[in-house]
Structures are given as C-alpha cells and as structure tokens.
Curated annotation (Swiss-Prot):
Domain of life: Bacteria
Protein's name according to its UniProt entry: Porphobilinogen deaminase
Cofactor(s) listed in the protein's UniProt record: dipyrromethane
Name of the top EC class for this enzyme: transferase
Upper taxonomic lineage: Bacteria, Pseudomonadati, Pseudomonadota, Betaproteobacteria, Burkholderiales
Length: 333
C-alpha cells in the first residue's frame, strides 16, 4: 500500500531560476495553472514561471463518453510526456481527472487545499433536480453522476455531456439540456458561481475521489521540483484524497465505473464514505469508516477498510462486469 504522493525529504534545493508548468488549454485548466504559477512567483520572486499549454486527446474526442474511449488518462498523457522529456517541470491537474494509479516514473508532488467538493445543479429554468418535470433532459459527463440521477430520479432523461466547462454551459444555454450537473469547484474558480442553482448534498451525490482538489504531478526523479512545491502542499487535503483514491484503486475503479469516495475531517478524525453503483442506479453499495489519520499509511489503511467492506457487499462483481462491458464496447467501436 504505497503512497503515490512524493516525499521531498528534509534537504532543500536552491531556489529555481525557471519553472515550466504543463497544462491543458481549457479556460479552467489555465486558471488552475495560473493559480499555481502565481503561488510559485510569491514563493520565488526571482523565478521565471511559464505555462506550456497543451491540447490532450481527451480534449479532442468530444463525440463519445470517456468511459468508451480510454478514460481519464486521455487528459494527462500529453502532459506526462512533457514532464518525461523535460519540456515541463510540473503539471497541474484537477485531481478527479487523474487516473487512480500513476504510471511508473511519475508522482504527485503536492496536493493543494480543496475547493468545494460538491456537485452543482445548473439550469436556466429550474431551481433544483426535484423541480424538473418527467422526461426533462439532464446532461452529465460521468457515470457516477448518471447512476445517481437514475437511482434518485428515474423519470428524467439522462444524456452524455462532453466538452470543457464553457462548452457544456453553451450547450445548456442553447437548449440542448434542461439542466446539467457540474463540479462546483470549477464554476467557483472561474467566477461562475451565479450559474449554480443548487449545490447537491454529498449524501445525495457522493463526489468523485479527489473532486475539488488540485494535484501537481512531476517526474518521480525530480526531487528538486518536489522540494520547491512543498509549501503548496496541504497535508489535510492530501490525507483525505489519499484515502479516497485508495478506495477506487483497490477496487480497480475508473471513469468506466460509477464509483465515488469522499472524506471529511471531523473533530480530528477522518470520515470516509465509498459508494459503488450499477450504471442504471438500481443497485447502490455504500460503506463508511473513520479513524485518527496521521500519516499516508493511515489514510491508505482507511481507504482499504472501506474498499474491503464494499468488496464484501459485491462491489468487485459490479466493477468487473462494467469493465468487461466497456472493453466489449471499445472493440465494437
């Protein structure tokens, strides 16, 4: 149960002269990269911090859902290539879009303080999910949200929604959907909080592992970069996210599976909930655990406890069936 988060150790590296941040080119991704750039400039005023904007394969494929074309790795592969060949020193990601197991040679050097982890209901005509009439079209980009909608609102027509945040809002505004479900964090970061009609309680729509948090990835051998990024690391968020990602990793989860995991701190203990559903929402498994989490090993153990309980309820059967089905779909495409 190794942690995927880099430990920079006690030594300090000389202040950097230059740093290059790899980022997707969407407005939200660039905001996130600029947020990290500005933080680094404050830490290292003499450092020339640049952003290398890149278009990923995930940004190019807009006519199919992620679960049918290769998953979350489509958003990070090009950025990792830039880390590997030295064009970039670090890459900034929405952590929920990072595969649960990083490729060999890469590590998460810092996880920043989390924004709102909840899902947001966005609509021009309706105040909440409960207000939508039968047959109303709701757009979502994830199987996790789709399963939630089908379980709680079987009378709604749930359809895929691809594209970056601005594209999704444009599709709503032109009338393709009565409502869409988005991550609240992205809307808030771009100053679009006014578009949120309602925030969905985590009990009703448990967030994806890492939702609302930014992760900074590096090449694993770059201990110097890890040390420079250490001041941006938020330990409480990192431990929570480590536990969440362990739930998904232990069960073999991906964007091809409606799997959610969310941890919150209460009175010094970490409370972790995991949930696995069938895509039609007819079967929903849930498990919880809590404990005094002080180290990454503690967080991993908590995540393992929740995944073991879900496994005992039959979660792995759901995951394996969905993954087998997705592979058939890819072969037929």
């Amino acid at each position: 149960m190794n942690s995927e988060t880099f430990s920079a150790g006690p030594k300090s590296a000389p202040a950097p002269a230059t740093l290059t941040i790899a980022s997707r080119e969407s407005r939200l991704a660039m905001w996130q990269a600029e947020h990290v750039r500005d933080a680094l400039r404050k830490l290292y005023p003499a450092c020339d911090v640049k952003i290398l904007g890149m278009t990923t394969r995930g940004d190019q494929i807009l006519d199919r859902t992620l679960s049918k074309v290769g998953g979350k790795g489509l958003f990070v592969k090009e950025l990792e290539n830039a880390l590997a060949d030295g064009r970039a020193d670090l890459a900034v990601h929405s952590l929920k879009d990072v595969p649960m197991a990083l490729p060999d040679g890469f590590a998460l050097a810092a996880i920043m303080a989390r924004e709102d982890a909840r899902d947001a209901f966005v609509s021009n005509d309706y105040a909440s999910l409960d207000a939508l009439p039968a047959g109303a079209v709701v757009g979502t980009s994830s199987l996790r949200r789709e399963a939630m909608l089908r379980a709680r609102y079987p009378h709604l027509n749930v359809l895929p929604l691809r594209g970056n945040l601005d594209t999704r809002l444009a599709k709503l505004d032109r009338g393709d959907y009565a409502a869409i479900i988005l991550a609240a964090a992205g809307l808030k970061r771009l100053g679009l909080e006014a578009r949120i009609r309602a925030l969905i309680d985590v009990e009703d729509s448990l967030p994806a592992a890492g939702q609302g948090a930014l992760g900074i990835e590096i090449a694993a051998h770059r201990s110097d970069v890890a040390q420079w990024l250490a001041p941006l690391h938020d330990p409480h968020t990192a431990l929570a996210v480590e536990a969440e990602r362990m739930v998904s990793r232990a069960l073999g989860g991906s964007c091809e599976v409606p799997l959610a995991a969310h941890a919150v701190w209460r009175a010094g203990e970490l409370y972790l909930t995991g949930r696995v559903s069938t895509t039609d929402g007819r079967r929903v498994l849930s498990a919880q655990a809590c404990g005094a989490v002080m180290t990454a090993a503690d967080a991993l153990a908590l995540g393992r406890a929740v995944s073991d309980e879900l496994d005992a309820q039959g979660a792995r059967d759901i995951v394996n069936a969905l993954l087998a089905g997705s592979q058939v779909g890819k072969g037929d495409a």
